[in-house]
Amino acid sequence: MSDQVKITPMTLNFGPQHPAAHGVMRLVLEMGGEVIERIDPHIGLLHRGTEKLIEYKTYLQALPYFDRLDYVSPMAQEHAYSLCVEKLLKCEIPIRAKYLRVIFCELTRILNHLLNISSQALDIGAMTPLLWMFEEREKILGFYERASGARFHSAYIRPGGVAADVPSDLIDDIFKFVSTFSKFMDDIDDLLTENRIWKQRNVDIGVVSKKQALDWGFSGPMLRACGIPWDLRKSQPYEIYEDLEFEIPVGENGDCYDRYLVRMAEIRQSIKLLEQCLDRLPDGPVKTDDRKIAPPKRSEMKESMEALIHHFKLYSEGYSVPVGETYMAVEAPKGEFGVYIVSDGTNKPYRCRIRAPGFAHLQAIDIIAKGHMLADLTAIIGSLDIVFGEIDR
């Protein structure tokens, strides 16, 4: 009689120093041979205590923390925070500022999806899309720099409007970029979409059902790839989105390939939105008239003592926000990015809670990847579009 051998799963560490980990992610895998039986994600390696740090800053000083959350699509986070503070202040912003916000938020969406698609392709072994797409990303970062002075951490969208009006020739350059970008997207389509190796690595990999997506709190392209047309720009419109025409791309199977297709389609919809905004962009101010919230112009400060006092008070003490609490969410490139602020009537938030879409997507990695081969894990992680700045906070 032979002794029965009990086979236990092998434990394997994936990351945190791994090129496909997209930052500082550590996964503890239980493997049955080459098949994944269980995944335990370990987070917190990039934790900085952002929510607590915000409690010690004025409402304006807290803004740059949001750029550093999802650092590949910074303006979307600033936007959510600014809308949340404006809701508490009951502050109306000029129409030109709304248009500029939407223009830069849609450029941010393109910026994010270009990085995600190129890195997903690189994880699987295709290097060409990365080289092509980073050239286009560089152009968008150039627009960021010309508008705000910074390529990444721009702090451009602020409570009360935007930091400053854009240079006169920037709008023309964005228009030129947008008009030729569809041709570039066609080239990427030709390169990837029907490529048989790309399809073999992505079709029917990491399938998520509609019920699972809703149960785990998915949003953004992850939810829409399952066939649920949920987009905050349509369902709970903010800024000027109700006046713009665009469609919500949805998938059918909820697999890695559908998530890729949804992001590709979203880039095309962003181009459509940008064309409408650039055509209709009105003239006028870009900040609210309330000098307790937005600083006065330099020319005013040279002539008016009150303007100088307003400027000094704004950047030293800040403004007090009425007592109350509110939640505001925007359709960020990765999903629903929400900010919940509790104000106690002082110049600093009493509590600020951040809802990061990537957190909900990463927590479901066990159910998504279970039963797949180890080689498929890189494709699944690439399709989740996770950044640890916002997950660890």
UniProtKB/Swiss-Prot annotation:
It is a peripheral membrane protein. InterPro entries: NADH_Q_OxRdtase_suD, NADH_UbQ_OxRdtase_49kDa_CS, NDH1_su_D/H, NiFe-Hase_large. Pfam families: Complex1_49kDa (PF00346). Keywords: Cell inner membrane, Cell membrane, Membrane, NAD, Quinone, Translocase, Transport, Ubiquinone. Its EC number is 7.1.1.-. Transmembrane segments: none annotated. It is an enzyme of class 7 (translocase). It catalyses: a quinone + NADH + 5 H(+)(in) = a quinol + NAD(+) + 4 H(+)(out). The keyword Ligase does not apply. It is found in: Cell inner membrane. Gene3D superfamilies: Cytochrome-c3 Hydrogenase, chain B. It comes from the Bacteria. GO terms for cellular component: plasma membrane. One of its GO terms (molecular function) is quinone binding. Belongs to the complex I 49 kDa subunit family. NDH-1 is composed of 14 different subunits. Subunits NuoB, C, D, E, F, and G constitute the peripheral sector of the complex. PANTHER family: NADH DEHYDROGENASE [UBIQUINONE] IRON-SULFUR PROTEIN 2, MITOCHONDRIAL, NADH-UBIQUINONE OXIDOREDUCTASE 49 KDA SUBUNIT. NDH-1 shuttles electrons from NADH, via FMN and iron-sulfur (Fe-S) centers, to quinones in the respiratory chain. The immediate electron acceptor for the enzyme in this species is believed to be ubiquinone. Couples the redox reaction to proton translocation (for every two electrons transferred, four hydrogen ions are translocated across the cytoplasmic membrane), and thus conserves the redox energy in a proton gradient. NCBIfam families: NuoD, PRK06075.1. This is NADH-quinone oxidoreductase subunit D. It comes from Ehrlichia canis (strain Jake). The gene is nuoD.
